[in-house]
Amino acid sequence: MNTEIKYLELLSKTFKNIAETSTEIINLQAIMNLPKGTEHFMTDIHGEYEAFNHVLRNGSGTIRNKIEEAYGNKLTENEKKELASIIYYPKEKVELMQNKDNFNIDRWMITIIYRLIEVCKVVCSKYTRSKVRKAMTKDFEYILQELLYEKKELANKKEYFDSIVDTIISIDRGKEFIIAICNLIQRLNIDHLHIVGDIYDRGPFPHLIMDTLAEYSNLDIQWGNHDILWIGAALGNKACIANVIRICCRYNNNDILEEAYGINLLPFATFAMKYYGDDPCKRFRAKEGVDSDLIAQMHKAMSIIQFKVEGLYSERNPELEMSSRESLKHINYEKGTINLNGVEYPLNDTNFPTVNPENPLELLEEEAELLDKLQASFLGSEKLQKHMQLLFAKGGMYLKYNSNLLFHACIPMEPNGEFSELFVEDGYYKGKALMDKIDNIVRQAYYDRKNVEVNKKHRDFIWYLWAGRLSPLFGKDVMKTFERYFIDDKTTHKEIKNPYHKLINDEKVCDKIFEEFGLNPRTSHIINGHIPVKVKEGESPVKANGKLLIIDGGFSRAYQSTTGIAGYTLTYNSYGMKLASHLKFISKEAAIKDGTDMISSHIIVETKSKRMKVKDTDIGKSIQTQINDLKKLLKAYRIGLIKSN
């Protein structure tokens, strides 16, 4: 009781009397009855900034829905298309129209402003005026409020309304106002953004994606396997650093390292030329961009360094059971073959100038110095560390949100449907306990990052999360990087998916996972990414009778020939859940000039029989707790237990 009174006394410092407390209760109770805000789910972006940015701007088709709601048949299809294009790219679209010959730009702007106001009214209708005001550009806050909340239809308001718009145009602020109202529409169209892993990978602009995400307040991120790789690199894990650089070389993306994050690759390039200058490096030509001998040499040089470091990490962490990644130890350097599980395979490349056959995992002094310098660069990159800070502040292994369970790849399972056990640090963990333990270890590694000698085990474990058999982020038995480079026999390349990926077609398995995480099996969904959905082969993103959704459909251009589409995204609003299937993104220029969009179709996953309100959400539960506390404070004021100020 004393604790409760102390809490109420603390609360009374904010709500100082009966009037203030009552007002807050009324306000919160009103919010509870507003429609639930729209959640937007995206995954496996893989550095494809332009496509990601476009999907954010169009809200996976929800902007078009708002235009339809505002105008129905009052506008032609081309007019709706133009309006959508303006909302997505207001600055660029206005500038395009301004450069048209013999075009009345003022009249066009007036028409567009009126249309945007109607769309904005629809978007704002599910929010309080306070929330809408906070989302407004300060320069136009008062004008926007007047235009949004005044009724133009009233005779005594029409002239007032029209004069505001006319003045905006006459003082040459039309472009800025259109940008402001379009930004407001975009900002309020999506109430909460979920990124279900893999911001990083082969695409060229993950840093721009991170910059964009930093602008979102209502955001969460579930770490993907490529994200954890960059986290490990940023924390000084040398195996992760080697993998990151190798992948950047593979896809000709060294600009990410050098230009975006300020990591100096010149000493590494010099090293690669010294040892591989006369090597054609046929298996190491860049997959994208201009073919370059130097990039191929760097690619091979870092691959060999990676195989050495991974072997050393495996040796010093035998409990991780990663000995299969000690590949260089299994090579017969005289015969040019490798022994895998008792079978001898010829190598397609036997030039290993930096490998000592007597001690193949030993780093050359130059390699060790190079890794030390690269480690210092990753640890010292201000922008990289800032981006990793965002991944820790907003991210984690999984999230429970509004009866949905979000995680990137899998919960490791056995073929019989039981959760797999993994020995981590001090014991065996499985299911939810494993996810929580991993989250804790990664955070401990982050807090110890400034002293690379502290808790090496924590930092080493991050490499296991990238490539380990029971890693919830990897979801396969083994990563066959060496085999794919050096062995032509493709049977050695096969990576077997964790049983989870087959078992999730069974509703009972999904129910088991819901129960493990304390969720109601009747109302919950699992939302995953990681495994591209092969739509052109008839595969569906909806599994287990709608209980599980896989929304990786191929943002990455490299996967689009396999999937047949350019990705899935998911929206969850007050009416239910809807999957959007995306066409390949042509270009930002085409979207601006021709109104080209990415949405090809929608799949209704779930329709609510009764429209969901804020009170039906996790935020609603939190607000209800606040209301209950305020009612206690109100009672305390009325009976004199706490003095009213």
Curated annotation (Swiss-Prot):
Its cofactor is Mn(2+). Its EC number is 3.1.3.11. InterPro entries: FBPtase_class3, Metallo-depent_PP-like. Signal peptide: none annotated. The keyword Hydrolase applies. It comes from the Bacteria. The keyword Hydrolase applies. HAMAP family: FBPase_class3 (MF_01854). This is Fructose-1,6-bisphosphatase class 3. It comes from Fusobacterium nucleatum subsp. nucleatum (strain ATCC 25586 / DSM 15643 / BCRC 10681 / CIP 101130 / JCM 8532 / KCTC 2640 / LMG 13131 / VPI 4355). The gene is fbp.
